[in-house]
């Protein structure tokens, strides 16, 4: 069927498939970041319950390092902020790509409209 289609429509279909793949990839990234956000929030909630002089260890690569509650809270808050910004950025990209997907879909349907009858 695609060999019967004009090159312009074939190109639009290829773009549509590419945009669809990009939206799926962004959706996966968004899910991963949301999971990381949830982990950070849970860790922060646990830290807040501890005494200020509690002994805390955190993982850094292959090492486990002793740290303070204050430093751990600060790092987790920074991480939450960074993840939130990344999530906002991904959401904006996802919105733009979804709009582009719908636009391409409409263009293809309009171009194929007379052929479908």
UniProtKB/Swiss-Prot annotation:
Keywords: Chaperone, Cytoplasm. The keyword Repeat does not apply. Transmembrane segments: none annotated. Its main location: cytoplasm. GO terms for cellular component: cytoplasm; prefoldin complex. GO terms for molecular function: protein-folding chaperone binding; unfolded protein binding. InterPro entries: PFD_beta-like (IPR002777), PfdB (IPR012713), Prefoldin (IPR009053). Belongs to the prefoldin subunit beta family. Heterohexamer of two alpha and four beta subunits. Molecular chaperone capable of stabilizing a range of proteins. Seems to fulfill an ATP-independent, HSP70-like function in archaeal de novo protein folding. HAMAP family: PfdB (MF_00307). This is Prefoldin subunit beta.
């Amino acid at each position: 069927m695609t060999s019967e289609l004009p090159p312009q429509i074939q190109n639009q279909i290829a773009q549509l498939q590419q945009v669809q793949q990009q939206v799926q990839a962004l959706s996966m990234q968004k899910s991963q970041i949301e999971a990381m956000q949830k982990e950070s929030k849970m860790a922060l909630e646990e830290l807040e319950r501890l005494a200020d002089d509690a002994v805390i260890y955190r993982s850094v690569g292959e090492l486990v390092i002793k740290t303070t509650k204050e430093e751990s809270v600060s790092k987790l808050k920074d991480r939450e902020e960074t993840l939130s910004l990344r999530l906002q950025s991904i959401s904006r990209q996802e919105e733009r790509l979804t709009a582009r997907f719908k636009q391409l879909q409409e263009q293809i349907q309009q171009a194929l409209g007379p052929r479908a009858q």
